């Protein structure tokens, strides 16, 4: 085994094929004792430094940390550097909000659109003015109690100071040779406790205190039309008591959908969460001694712990995406429909990537770190687990798409009464009667809270179940078979990723844990795309179906989603084709930026197909031809190009595929919602 790596216990899951005798068995040389993981050595390093292979090694070996005492220093330094970059980004957002946005105007009249970044009219760029802000920062700033640009500037300055401190700390932890850093950060369990207590626990407590003493009084005063004093004057409990006694919290429960009472519940939630994290991490189930994650060698594996944390964070991101519309916390968010859509879509994508990353790092941990014997119980039952999951996927796929096939057939035959719909064969979800659509109107602004479930929701929800279970099947299979399989029983010796060797060794293509992550990313893209398509179509069609009655109240008629999403043609015609009208026809209008992003993202997506549909031979021929032409012209590059490997080609392919798809969807959604409900 490589130096510094723990011995891997003997695999007890190797399955020997009975028809393979020892004399016909191919001997595989998987001894990596002379190689150093994470860096090439000897002639390989010398050759790679003069070729483009060195660039790919930087990406491919990004997670190849050695199990030395410097591991914690590397991880901690990278963590601080990442936080420093985040502080710079936050500082920039507050700086531009202070100097180049209409935040103060928005505070006076929250019904106007939040905008920023006035574009200079050099070559008719003023057509883009004003650039719409859909990040939700205006709502967040008001929830924080920020009422002036001076406060934004102060926060921007402190953000730069915090980023500088993080970068200095990163440099210190990475390059300091003192034993202080090594002793402080060697224990992974102590670092996890630090995150629970210091960051999450105390951070939640500080945020709860800020909400109670600053944010809630400021929002009460603003909603009551009273001049807001300096935040420093609100720090005393007497001032807060006076405000609450005179104005009460009823000012935060107005029915216009602007300022919602959940801001009060948010303070309670973070206070309770702080108590659970601080007390529980020391005495309770979150402590090192009783934490099931730390009870075996998971606690000594950075990758396994990171996988669990990514899984929890990704799940929390998906849950917040649902709450951004179902139970919004921030003031005036319900009437800012483009921001609601952006928050939902953004957090769904973040959750999807984090969940796939969780399985990737869990697989790396299983391959490279010592496994406890207790976990072998799960690995010995993996065939049964995957067998059941496969049948679930097959059942969901056949029946969920069968509903749409039935409706397509009945529509083609001219038999609408035999279709699954609210007006014919109704398939309402079980809890549909408890899910209601709440509509409120103040002036020209309309707020939408919740959703009414229909047969269309029942059908598309089963598509969600199918795509999500398929993604889980792929990722769980790659995770459980990361160490060994029927075909290759020594995967743990080959590491997390290894090249496709073709049929020579019995076929080792698409069986490494990396290949499962690669395939899982595409199915994650499918899953999230169907979810955000469902949400966006139903959300914007509910807005379009709202009609005002003679008495001033509002009601919702049958929406386009309910009527047309029950068959395949409706998704293609009413959603994609008709819904793309705004982004396609946006040239010469303030939506032109989305119109430019839309075809550009399509190009990036289409470029990915060149990498995904090609093999290594194509790139080898291409590079050889390019090199031949350079040598004929006596223009020889100093860094010699090398053909893309299969792994590298797939990495380039799925990166462009996902970025292009996300950019296309984002521009399509925003152009539509800004034009129709912005």
Swiss-Prot record:
PANTHER family: OUTER MEMBRANE PROTEIN, OMPA-RELATED, PHOTOSYSTEM I P700 CHLOROPHYLL A APOPROTEIN A1-RELATED. Its main location: plastid. Its EC number is 1.97.1.12. GO terms for cellular component: chloroplast thylakoid membrane; photosystem I. P700 is a chlorophyll a/chlorophyll a' dimer, A0 is one or more chlorophyll a, A1 is one or both phylloquinones and FX is a shared 4Fe-4S iron-sulfur center. Phylloquinone binds at residue 619. Belongs to the PsaA/PsaB family. PsaA and PsaB bind P700, the primary electron donor of photosystem I (PSI), as well as the electron acceptors A0, A1 and FX. PSI is a plastocyanin/cytochrome c6-ferredoxin oxidoreductase, converting photonic excitation into a charge separation, which transfers an electron from the donor P700 chlorophyll pair to the spectroscopically characterized acceptors A0, A1, FX, FA and FB in turn. Oxidized P700 is reduced on the lumenal side of the thylakoid membrane by plastocyanin or cytochrome c6. GO terms for biological process: photosynthesis. Chlorophyll a binds at residues 610, 618. One of its GO terms (molecular function) is 4 iron, 4 sulfur cluster binding. It catalyses: reduced [plastocyanin] + hnu + oxidized [2Fe-2S]-[ferredoxin] = oxidized [plastocyanin] + reduced [2Fe-2S]-[ferredoxin]. HAMAP family: PSI_PsaA. Chlorophyll a' binds at residue 602. It is a multi-pass membrane protein. The chain crosses the membrane at residues 75-98, 152-175, 192-216, 266-284, 302-325, 341-367, 384-406, 458-476, 516-537, 591-613, 651-671. [4Fe-4S] cluster binds at residues 500, 509. The PsaA/B heterodimer binds the P700 chlorophyll special pair and subsequent electron acceptors. PSI consists of a core antenna complex that captures photons, and an electron transfer chain that converts photonic excitation into a charge separation. The eukaryotic PSI reaction center is composed of at least 11 subunits. This is Photosystem I P700 chlorophyll a apoprotein A1. It is found in: Plastid, Chloroplast thylakoid membrane. Keywords: 4Fe-4S, Chlorophyll, Chloroplast, Chromophore, Electron transport, Iron, Iron-sulfur, Magnesium, Membrane, Metal-binding, Oxidoreductase, Photosynthesis, Photosystem I, Plastid, Thylakoid, Transmembrane, Transmembrane helix, Transport. It comes from Amphidinium carterae (Dinoflagellate). It comes from the Eukaryota.
């Amino acid at each position: 085994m490589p130096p510094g790596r723990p011995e891997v216990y003997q695999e007890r899951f190797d399955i020997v094929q009975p028809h393979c005798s020892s004399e016909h068995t191919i001997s595989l040389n998987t001894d990596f004792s002379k190689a150093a993981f994470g860096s090439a050595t000897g002639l390989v390093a010398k050759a790679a430094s003069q070729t483009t292979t060195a660039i790919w090694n930087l990406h491919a070996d990004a997670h190849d940390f050695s199990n030395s005492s410097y591991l914690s220093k590397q991880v901690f330094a990278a963590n601080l550097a990442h936080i420093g970059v985040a502080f710079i980004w936050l500082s920039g957002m507050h700086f531009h909000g202070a100097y180049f946005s209409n935040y103060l105007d928005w505070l006076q009249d929250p019904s106007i659109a939040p905008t920023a970044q006035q574009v200079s009219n050099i070559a008719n760029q003023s057509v883009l003015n004003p650039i719409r802000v859909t990040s939700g920062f205006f709502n967040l700033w008001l929830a924080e109690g920020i009422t002036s640009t001076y406060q934004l500037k102060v926060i921007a300055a402190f953000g730069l100071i915090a980023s500088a401190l993080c970068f200095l700390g990163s440099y210190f932890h990475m390059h300091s040779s003192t034993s202080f850093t090594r002793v402080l950060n060697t224990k992974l369990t102590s670092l996890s406790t630090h995150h629970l207590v210091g960051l999450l626990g105390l951070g939640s407590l500080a945020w709860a205190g800020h909400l109670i003493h600053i944010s809630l009084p400021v929002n009460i005063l603003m909603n009551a039309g009273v001049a807001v004093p300096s935040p420093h004057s609100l720090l005393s409990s007497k001032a807060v008591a006076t405000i609450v006694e005179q104005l009460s919290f009823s000012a935060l429960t107005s029915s216009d959908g602007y300022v919602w009472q959940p801001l009060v519940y948010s303070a309670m939630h973070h206070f309770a969460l702080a108590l659970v994290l601080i007390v529980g991490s020391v005495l309770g189930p979150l402590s090192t001694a009783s934490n099931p994650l730390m009870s075996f060698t998971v606690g000594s594996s950075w990758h396994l712990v990171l996988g669990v944390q990514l899984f929890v964070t990704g799940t929390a991101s998906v849950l917040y995406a649902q709450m951004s519309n179902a139970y919004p916390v921030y003031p005036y968010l319900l009437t800012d429909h483009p921001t609601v859509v952006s928050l939902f879509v953004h957090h769904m994508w973040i959750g999807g990537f984090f969940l796939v990353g969780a399985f990737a790092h869990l697989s790396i941990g299983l391959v490279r770190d010592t496994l406890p014997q207790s976990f072998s119980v799960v690995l010995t039952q993996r065939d049964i687990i995957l067998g059941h999951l496969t049948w679930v996927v097959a059942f969901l796929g056949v029946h969920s798409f069968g509903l749409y096939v039935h409706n397509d057939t009945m529509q083609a035959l001219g038999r609408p009464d035999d279709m699954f719909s609210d007006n014919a064969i109704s398939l309402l979800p079980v809890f549909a009667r408890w899910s209601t659509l709440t509509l409120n109107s103040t002036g020209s602004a309309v707020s939408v809270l919740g959703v009414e479930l229909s047969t269309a929701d029942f059908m598309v929800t089963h598509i969600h179940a199918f795509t999500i279970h398929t993604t889980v099947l792929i990722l769980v299979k790659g995770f459980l078979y990361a160490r060994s399989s029927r075909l290759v029983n020594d995967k743990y010796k080959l590491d997390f990723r290894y090249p496709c060797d073709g049929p020579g060794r019995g076929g080792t293509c698409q069986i490494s844990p990396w290949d499962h992550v690669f395939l899982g990313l595409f199915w994650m893209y499918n899953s999230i795309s169907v979810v955000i398509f469902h949400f966006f179509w139903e959300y914007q069609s509910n807005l379009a179906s709202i009609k005002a009655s003679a008495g001033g109240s509002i009601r919702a008629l049958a929406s386009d989603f309910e009527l047309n999403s029950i068959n395949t043609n409706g998704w293609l015609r009413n959603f994609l084709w008709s819904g793309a009208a705004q982004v396609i026809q946006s040239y010469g209008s303030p939506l032109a930026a989305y119109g430019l992003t839309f075809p550009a993202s399509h190009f990036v997506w289409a470029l990915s197909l060149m990498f995904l549909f090609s093999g290594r031979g194509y790139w080898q021929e291409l590079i050889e031809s390019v090199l031949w032409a350079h040598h004929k012209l006596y223009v020889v590059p100093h860094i010699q190009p090398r053909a893309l490997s299969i792994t590298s080609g797939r990495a380039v392919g799925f990166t462009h595929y996902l970025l292009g798809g996300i950019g296309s969807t984002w521009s399509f959604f925003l152009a539509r919602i800004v034009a129709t409900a912005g």
